[in-house]
Amino acid sequence: MISSYGDVDMELRDEDLILEEVRDYLTAYLRNIHQEDIILDNERVVVDLNQLYNYGLMEFVEFLINNPQKGIDFIKECYNDAYYTLRNEYPTNVIIAVKNLPKIFKTTRKGKIFTIEDIRSKTLGKLVEFEGIIVMASKIRPMLKKAYYICPKCGREVVREIDILNTDSEKAVCECGAELNLIEHKSIYTDFQEIKVQQPLDLMENPEEPPKYITVFLENSPGIYAGRVKITGIPIKVKKSKKLPIYDIHVKALHCEVLDGEVKIKLTNSDIENIKKIAKRKDVVNILADRLIPEIKGHSAIKKAVLLQQIKGVKKPGKRADIHILLITDPGIGKTVILRKIAEIPGNLYGSVTTATGVGLTAAVVREKTEIGEDTWVIKPGLLVKAHKGTACIDELTVNKELQSYVLEAMESQTIHISKGGINAKLPAECAILAACNPRWGRFNPEVSVAEQINIPAPLLSRFDLIFPIRDVSDKDKDKDIAEYIVDLHRAYLDEKINREMGLDYLEVDGVKIDKEFIIKYIYYARQKKPIISEKAKELFVNYYVEMRKKHQITARQLEAAIRIAEAHAKAKLKDVVDEEDAKEAINIITECLKEIAYDPETGIFDVDKILGVSKKERDKLTTVYEIIKELSEKSELVEHEDIAEEAKKKGIKEDELENIIKKLIKYGDIDEPKPGRYRLL
């Protein structure tokens, strides 16, 4: 049998003999398994090669992999015969595609799954199967597939099957020497699309190496613009240099399957046993959170929140399961280390807004010359689309007004709509966002609203479930601990004994080795759980929301966030029910977060509007001054500053406060100042 692409361990028998031996058997298989295709007269029939292999046609599948075009033509012959036995006629223009190679044929000699980086000259003309993430997709264009010609000189009609590489197909010449004319109404066209795919990082032999790409040609494409795909196709060579015999390798796809995007991780019985063993510990969440980012000292609340973000809440119709987190950090805290560490989890991606354009977050539609030489519109999915089903780790997050609506849609509905250049598509962006940025003035100021300190619009800011300011506050004892940890960290990389003492690479708990690989497997296993909220947990959530609404200015968004966090906490402990413990933990995380960013010391309450730049107290004062100007404007179109100040003083508003309030009313577009010191309503 074939143990890897292009390496045959057994001598193939005569091709015609192999085909004739399986003809009746294959015809019977197609008549039984693809009976629905025949009855419905489907134009495209997809044959599952793994199923065919298990059916007993091992030698034919091996033949097809080494001779894909001849093998598919033979399947088509047998399908036509099967079709005839059921319908007493032959099909017209049926297209045969194949998918799902048996495992033995998509494993390399090294024992790893076949990937883009394994496509070499030895695989040319063979059948291969690999996964990729779409990084560019052209618009759909018609491609001539079956051409009907007529000779204007002798009247002879000619029919030709057109291959994707036959660029001279429309300049066919008759035997008499005259150039043939294409008969448009008879000729058959198919939908053609060109995509470029990147090898997923989780399938890279060395994730530190630059990612590998390959161009794929799709025929009969429904229009695929983003996501993770599995391609079954034939590597072909395309000459690029006119002077040298050097070629580029592309893939002619026979089948393209859009995957759900979630990375599949193989777990052994031993893995599951160890996961369940650790899950029994009361401190399991703390252990995993601390080991998730061992390079960073402290910040346990943030580590815990990020761990729960990776596990996710429970997906429900119309409700996202992903938890969005924003870190606002003073310089030198290590936000990039946190983001890059989380990006190492399969399915997650890292990107910095400083090194990518704004549309690099969402998607771009640009005109570009494709491999077939045409200048056309193409979609280039951005970070949020490529991180579908994972986490988008965004460094130096800033969002301009032009991009705001796209990112807002991605955060809330988890899709991105694109309509430009004849391309109208809805791209999936079901991902969590772990973003980080520095305060505008260098260091975070708890006295100033979050919105005023960062370049992120208020509507987007409100979509983050958790916002953590990480401040660099001088503390002698704490500074000493951090300094010692940093020095030991450098020593641990070179000294195995210190490494073990620190537990940098791994920590042994109850006989289980807790390392990066184990945590990834634990997260993947925990994600599969779907705990239901218990009555007692429900009561806690309801009471929390009602009590907080009485005293504090919070919204239903905080309740939704608490539910997602509680579900993730229950999943982290492998529970089937979200109980009181999980609800309390979620409420504590939300409350701690609000203390940092939404506590108003003047009123002693939590006010989420303070995050967005306007606290309840300030909002009341804005309303008061606006009403004063409104009342005074009934007497005069332009209201004098002195008159406003006099009335405001009666309402308890001081002069210095009034200046800021008037500036904000102008900023919000409620009033303007056509002349110095004179205002009017808008």
Curated annotation (Swiss-Prot):
The protein's name in its UniProt record: Uncharacterized MCM-type protein MJ1489
Keywords: ATP-binding, Cell cycle, DNA replication, DNA-binding, Nucleotide-binding, Transcription, Transcription regulation
Family (UniProt): Belongs to the MCM family.
Pfam assignment, any one: MCM_OB
CDD domains linked: MCM
Domain MCM stretches: 284-487
Binding-site positions, ATP: 329-336
SMART domains: MCM
InterPro entries associated with the record: MCM, MCM_4, MCM_CS, MCM_dom, MCM_lid, MCM_OB, NA-bd_OB-fold, P-loop_NTPase
Record field: transmembrane: none
Recorded GO MF terms: ATP binding; DNA helicase activity; single-stranded DNA binding
Domain of life of the source: Archaea
Gene Ontology CC: one annotated term: MCM complex
GO biological processes: DNA replication initiation
